[in-house]
């Protein structure tokens, strides 16, 4: 048995008889009691090292990315060059559907960074649509009657047609309501060298809306912060006036992309808020939902 079968499907070996045990003992004595050397894997490594580069790349591409970076590149100089090179990571990207199989091979130099960024790509904001009330949000300011989570479309509102999974929104009141989230990029899996050298694009998006029966104000502020929370880059929408509109009341997207922001970014602070313009008791202020922060490959 070569050990490649399913352990549960392999039968238990029968116990040797006393006569067979005696014969095995005699055979060991005849061999001088020498033990058979165990394969330490050097033979397999030597065999792999003899493979043509295209075949070796395909073998390496089957391994987990962390194992490639942490172990395989330490085996020898040739493997280090392959792991650090673009072809291996382009192949992994193609195998995992991150880029088309027949896509161009020379448009991007840093396929390793592209791979890791693509695998981590997700909305870094928690609870962007109010499914968990205000869970995940900090520095919450409850002006007027405070924030309230409402079901779409809400009174004098419209459905959110841009994403069918969005079912709720946050409604502000007759004085400024604000809330924020602070994203720890290193805790989310983005290491210092990647942030400082590659400086991947950071894309911020938010959606806001008013009511058809009341005008309102909306504002978005996003800051890129250092380890000590110094502001390294900032975007501010200013106060956006949303007029009452009996014919529309639709949702508007606001977005900003941070690039070339320099080394040292460790945190992202996302803050938005709103209020109404008529000072009516209740929740006639700006509505927000589907907020997002993405680190793009």
Swiss-Prot record:
Residues binding a carbohydrate: 211-213, 279-280
Domain FBA per the UniProt entry, residue ranges: 114-297
GO term, biological process aspect, one: glycoprotein catabolic process
Domain of life: Eukaryota
CC annotations in GO: cytoplasm; cytosol; endoplasmic reticulum; membrane; SCF ubiquitin ligase complex
Site feature (Important for carbohydrate binding) residues: 174
MF annotations from Gene Ontology: carbohydrate binding
Localization of this protein: Cytoplasm; Microsome membrane
SUPFAM superfamilies in UniProt: F-box domain, Galactose-binding domain-like
Ranges for domain F-box: 45-92
Subunit structure, interactors included: Component of the SCF(FBXO2) complex consisting of CUL1, RBX1, SKP1 and FBXO2. Predominantly detected as heterodimer with SKP1; the heterodimer with SKP1 is not part of the SCF(FBXO2) complex.
Functional note: Substrate recognition component of a SCF (SKP1-CUL1-F-box protein) E3 ubiquitin-protein ligase complex that mediates the ubiquitination and subsequent proteasomal degradation of target proteins. Involved in the endoplasmic reticulum-associated degradation pathway (ERAD) for misfolded lumenal proteins by recognizing and binding sugar chains on unfolded glycoproteins that are retrotranslocated into the cytosol and promoting their ubiquitination and subsequent degradation. Prevents formation of cytosolic aggregates of unfolded glycoproteins that have been retrotranslocated into the cytosol.
Protein name, per record: F-box only protein 2
